[in-house]
Amino acid sequence: MGGKGGKGGKGLGKVGAKKRHRRVIRENIQGITKPAIRRLARRGGVKRTLSGLVYDETRNVLKVFLENVVRDAVTYTEHARRKTVTALDVVYALKRQG
């Protein structure tokens, strides 16, 4: 009955174990700095300076895009009955976005 040892995979865990608390993160989108957005624009082919309103709009669009990618990646993971999101899940989610 050897087995590999280690923790069990799909069990319920310890009796009476607490659920892991997930920290609520707010305003992390401001971590996408103005110079970072400018570099992305340069890489995308923009040559002129950007208007001040562009930065907030870019942050909002990026946030929505990433939320959709993460949602799709998690959906792929759940469908495969896994708990870990793999790089392939993210690749498939990105391909689905277009």
UniProtKB/Swiss-Prot annotation:
The keyword Kinase does not apply. SMART domains: H4. Residues 1-14 have a biased composition (Gly residues). The nucleosome is a histone octamer containing two molecules each of H2A, H2B, H3 and H4 assembled in one H3-H4 heterotetramer and two H2A-H2B heterodimers. The octamer wraps approximately 147 bp of DNA. Belongs to the histone H4 family. Keywords: Chromosome, DNA-binding, Nucleosome core, Nucleus. One of its GO terms (molecular function) is structural constituent of chromatin. The keyword Nucleus applies. This is Histone H4-1. The lineage of its organism: Eukaryota, Sar, Alveolata, Ciliophora, Postciliodesmatophora. Residues 1-20 are annotated as: Disordered. It is found in: Nucleus; Chromosome. SUPFAM superfamilies: Histone-fold (SSF47113). InterPro entries: CENP-T/H4_C, Histone-fold, Histone_H4. Core component of nucleosome. Nucleosomes wrap and compact DNA into chromatin, limiting DNA accessibility to the cellular machineries which require DNA as a template. Histones thereby play a central role in transcription regulation, DNA repair, DNA replication and chromosomal stability. DNA accessibility is regulated via a complex set of post-translational modifications of histones, also called histone code, and nucleosome remodeling. GO terms for cellular component: nucleosome; nucleus.
